[in-house]
């Protein structure tokens, strides 16, 4: 921590526990790294939590593990990742007793504490990352609560870089501080005096480049905006919604989608199909606005063709699955959509009337092998335009300017949005814009031609099938078989087309590098770029800059930017054709006559994500921010402040008057306004002196007693309480711990947290049957709505209920749903029919209850409602015994009884839990049972005390005729 404000933040947090809220990109990871380094050198037991996700936790572990290793921390003192699969329970106690820093999911630490594997009094403290996500139902809150109940001296350090998420709700900051058991709040925005003085003292040499979009791109963006507005207006009109506050589907698409989702969530189940299609269209159009600025012209046009083909196939019924019906895009039939496709097509190619007196110009490339080839027969000529991305030309000019600057030579670092842009720019610099786009266009034509051939074959076979309808049966069968075969081929072609247009970013696992280009001078304009070499980095944590590559001296690897006929066919461009370090070391002696070392400068293209260490490892002289981002610009400022003597020139590229520029500015303004709200709220923040829990823990569940207190007041006595004795008894009963046994897998949910808040003593066990054991006779299988549907489809639920029914007297199926997410058990269209399908969810529930008559189904609308239901079920019953759980009673031993026969016997009249075992002990099978007399039934069932009522029912069941 070389900067002064880092030291100040570290000292403040070291002296007092608190929540640190820091601006994005200012290096909050350096503060966390300082604490990890500080406690790694000691024997203290420190827990590291991440409130965001397990993936974020794993990425943090890899990052901090490598950084601490670089700092010289002993390997034995490095942090340890605690995983259920890798660390057995028998070794955890010894592991925790040795101390150290441990990364792990909060649910694992809670289980280790409740099972006494982790001595909570030995834990020195907890470090929490992404603390803004903690709530009163999160498992992190339960861990902090258990920690503070048994450890009054341990520290709690919380960190976050999302100030906007602390002010998006009223009282969110105060609740977050309460859940974290903290009293101090440390705010460090970019405009903080200490930070501004340090970062503004040594700013980088900034060159801002505002790039204008082409006319076609402006037309596309305008069409997308108009389509979005049309969809929003239709959505409001159809559902009679109020105006969507906070957004209009404009440039700030991220915030608008959140507002749209929040306002439509309570009524989602009531929306008709057309409304859901409009919501899907709004999201897609906002995504296309971002894709317009990132993708090349051919990729963007092919994406539009894929969307159109997908929507058309759904309309034609090629996909019978109802899950894909929402993907139909109604906006494709609008006039704005035609303008969108027209402008996108003009970026790739355009049509020109063919002059019969003159031959077509030779400089223009003509390809007529795609879906529009038929237009060539009508005196039209297709001319490729292949419009370059405007940022490509500016990037080329920047690199040319850097190369001409002989005084400053060093590594060039280009920051891009994601790995898709990394591959795009690397291929552009390798092969030139024309060759790169031409290869993409030829792939598009080949795919389109393939689909056209399939469509024509299908139409021909359909016509042949219709003309032969009057033939004999054999001919009809042959025609039907051929139609089926062609239909399957058509689907396969569609799947192939879909796979080829999958533009998701692929996560790489290693560093990809290419620097193979011609060393000699001369040639096309792009050859100057290749002299620099190109290195691609995927953002992996363990970044190791490889040794310099070798370049071909005879110029066999060169490539031009213009229409070189030998470079037109680039369907299979491979940028990973560089030699490996091992192979170079083996053959280095034989290559000296043909290769020489690549001279600087080098070009490193890196995605913005996971770029925390790339600046220190590369130490670039020139930095190009290709896609604007708040975090990366501030990382560059911090890097320059840490290295004031290192010259750094920063090129910052943005599209002028675009959604990209608007989103960047809006994020800056949103962060600034959020910090200003936090500063004002901090001055008025009400903090309980006992909130830290070092004296007494505050339990939020006690607030629910106010409803009970209201019922004990008498209005005629001036509000005085009545029945003081009953109130005291009620309070004593509530103070007594209620025990509940929970399956260890259920700690991934929030229900154990709510149960603990309401005074339950939680005992975690790995249950073989059920999820919750409330008493010796009550066992609950808990399902969410989605899990319920999946369990019915797989048959797992039937097996689970069958196991509970054999062991417990009162098996219960609890169906829990989210109150903020409405749902329907039956599709609205099916309710209009005269009968329900036997495969519908209500029909399956009815079948389940008829199969298991003792099963009870309970619906719960929230975790808090579930807790009250558990209180009612447990009332008057003894607490469960953990030693008896997972133990099958002796009377139900599977060695003595046939469970299938037992299930049949339970459905007969007169058979109950008191006499079923007596019957099975004295009768061999059902046939023997049906031949018994009434007196024998009474003797076996010991039913004389009941006036032979049950025996008579069972005897009549076997002996009465059906017509009686």
From Swiss-Prot:
Ranges of biased composition (kind: Low complexity): 462-482
Recorded GO CC terms: nucleotide-excision repair factor 1 complex
Cofactor(s) essential for the protein: Mg(2+)
EC number: 3.1.-.-
SUPFAM superfamilies in the record: Restriction endonuclease-like (SSF52980), RuvA domain 2-like (SSF47781)
UniProt KW keywords: DNA damage, DNA repair, DNA-binding, Endonuclease, Hydrolase, Magnesium, Nuclease, Nucleus
Keyword DNA-binding: yes
Pfam families: ERCC4
Region of interest: Disordered: 360-379, 459-529, 545-571
GO molecular function, one term: damaged DNA binding
Subunit structure: Heterodimer composed of ercc1 and xpf/ercc4.
Known function: Structure-specific DNA repair endonuclease responsible for the 5-prime incision during DNA repair. Involved in homologous recombination that assists in removing interstrand cross-link.
Protein's UniProt name: DNA repair endonuclease XPF
Species this chain originates from: Dictyostelium discoideum (Social amoeba)
The organism's taxonomic lineage, starting at the top: Eukaryota, Amoebozoa, Evosea, Eumycetozoa, Dictyostelia
Gene encoding the protein: ercc4
């Amino acid at each position: 921590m070389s900067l002064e404000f880092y030291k100040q933040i570290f000292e403040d947090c070291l002296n007092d526990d608190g929540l640190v809220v820091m601006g994005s990109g200012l290096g909050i990871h350096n503060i966390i790294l300082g604490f990890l380094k500080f406690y790694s050198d000691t024997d203290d037991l420190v827990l590291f939590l991440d409130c965001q996700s397990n993936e974020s936790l794993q990425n943090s572990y890899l990052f901090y593990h490598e950084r601490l290793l670089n700092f010289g921390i002993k390997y034995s003192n490095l942090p340890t990742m605690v995983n259920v699969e890798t660390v057995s329970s028998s070794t955890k106690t010894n592991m925790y007793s040795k101390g150290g820093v441990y990364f792990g999911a909060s649910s694992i630490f809670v289980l280790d504490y409740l099972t006494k594997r982790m001595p909570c009094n030995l834990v020195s403290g907890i470090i929490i990352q992404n603390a803004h996500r903690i709530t009163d139902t999160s498992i992190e809150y339960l861990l902090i609560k258990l920690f503070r109940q048994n450890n009054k001296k341990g520290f709690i350090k919380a960190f976050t870089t999302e100030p906007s998420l602390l002010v998006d709700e009223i009282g969110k900051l105060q609740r977050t501080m309460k859940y974290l058991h903290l009293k101090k709040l440390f705010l460090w925005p970019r405009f903080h005096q200490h930070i501004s003085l340090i970062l503004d003292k040594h700013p980088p040499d900034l060159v801002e480049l505002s790039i204008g979009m082409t006319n076609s791109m402006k037309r596309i963006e305008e069409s997308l905006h108009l389509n979005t507005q049309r969809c929003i207006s239709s959505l409001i009109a159809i559902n009679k919604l109020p105006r969507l506050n906070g957004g209009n589907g404009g440039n700030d698409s991220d915030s608008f989608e959140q507002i749209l989702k929040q306002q439509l969530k309570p009524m989602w189940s009531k929306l008709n199909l057309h409304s859901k299609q409009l919501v899907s269209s709004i999201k897609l159009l906002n995504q296309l606005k971002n894709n317009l600025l990132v993708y090349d012209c051919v990729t963007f046009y092919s994406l539009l063709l894929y969307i159109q083909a997908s929507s058309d196939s759904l309309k034609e019924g090629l996909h019978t699955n109802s899950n894909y019906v929402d993907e139909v895009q109604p906006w494709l039939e609008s006039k704005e959509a035609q303008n969108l496709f027209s402008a996108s097509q003009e970026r790739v190619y355009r049509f020109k009337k063919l002059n019969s007196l003159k031959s077509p110009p030779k400089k223009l490339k003509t390809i007529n092998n795609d879906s529009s080839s038929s237009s060539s027969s009508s005196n039209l000529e297709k001319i490729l335009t292949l419009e370059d991305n405007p940022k490509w030309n500016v990037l080329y000019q920047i690199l040319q300017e850097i190369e001409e600057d002989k005084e400053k030579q060093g590594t060039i670092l280009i920051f891009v949005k994601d790995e898709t842009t990394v591959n795009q720019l690397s291929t552009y610099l390798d092969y030139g814009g024309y060759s790169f786009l031409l290869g993409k266009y030829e792939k598009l034509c080949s795919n389109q031609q393939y689909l056209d051939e399939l469509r024509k074959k299908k139409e021909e076979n359909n016509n042949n099938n219709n003309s032969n309808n009057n033939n004999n049966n054999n001919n009809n069968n042959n025609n039907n078989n051929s139609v089926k075969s062609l239909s399957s081929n058509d689907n396969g072609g569609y799947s192939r087309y879909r796979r080829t247009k999958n533009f998701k970013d692929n996560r790489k696992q290693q560093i990809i590098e290419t620097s193979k280009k011609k060393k000699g001078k001369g040639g096309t304009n792009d050859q100057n770029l290749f002299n620099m070499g190109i290195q691609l980095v995927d953002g992996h944590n363990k970044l190791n800059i490889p040794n310099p590559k070798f370049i071909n001296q005879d110029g066999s690897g060169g490539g031009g930017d213009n229409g070189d006929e030998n470079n037109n066919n680039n369907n299979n461009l491979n940028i990973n054709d560089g030699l490996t370090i091992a192979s170079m070391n083996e053959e280095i002696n034989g290559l000296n006559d043909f290769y020489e070392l690549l001279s600087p400068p080098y070009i490193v293209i890196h995605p913005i994500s996971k770029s925390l260490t790339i600046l220190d490892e590369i130490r670039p002289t020139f930095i190009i921010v290709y896609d604007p981002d708040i975090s990366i610009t501030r990382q560059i400022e911090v890097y320059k402040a840490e290295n004031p003597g290192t010259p750094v020139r920063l090129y910052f590229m943005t599209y002028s008057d675009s959604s990209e520029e608007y989103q960047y500015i809006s994020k800056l303004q949103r962060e600034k306004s959020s910090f200003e709200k936090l500063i004002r709220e901090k001055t008025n923040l009400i903090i309980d002196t006992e909130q830290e829990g070092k004296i007494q823990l505050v339990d939020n569940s006690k607030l629910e007693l106010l409803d009970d207190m209201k019922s004990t007041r008498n209005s005629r006595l001036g509000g005085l309480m009545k029945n003081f004795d009953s109130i005291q008894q009620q309070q004593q009963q509530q103070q007594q711990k209620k025990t509940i046994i929970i399956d260890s897998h259920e700690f991934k949910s929030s229900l154990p947290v709510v149960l603990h808040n309401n005074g339950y003593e939680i005992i975690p066990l790995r249950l073989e049957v059920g999820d919750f054991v409330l008493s010796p006779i009550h066992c609950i299988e808990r399902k969410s709505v989605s899990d319920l549907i999946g369990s019915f489809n797989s048959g797992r639920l039937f097996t689970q209920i069958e196991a509970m029914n054999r062991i417990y007297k009162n098996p219960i199926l609890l169906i829990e749903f989210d109150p903020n997410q409405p749902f329907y058990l039956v599709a609205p269209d099916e309710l209009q029919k005269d009968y329900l399908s036997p495969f519908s969810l209500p029909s399956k529930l009815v079948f389940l209850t008829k199969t298991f008559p003792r099963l009870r189904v309970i619906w719960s609308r929230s975790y808090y409602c579930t807790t009250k239901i558990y209180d009612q079920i447990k009332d008057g019953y003894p607490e469960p015994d953990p030693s008896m759980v997972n133990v099958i009673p002796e009377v139900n031993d599977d060695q003595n009884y046939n469970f299938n026969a037992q299930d049949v016997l339970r459905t007969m009249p007169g058979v109950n839990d008191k006499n079923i075992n007596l019957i099975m002990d004295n009768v061999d099978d059902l046939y023997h049972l049906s031949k018994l007399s009434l007196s024998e039934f009474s003797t076996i069932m010991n039913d004389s005390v009941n006036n032979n009522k049950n025996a008579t029912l069972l005897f009549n069941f076997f002996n009465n005729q059906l017509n009686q």
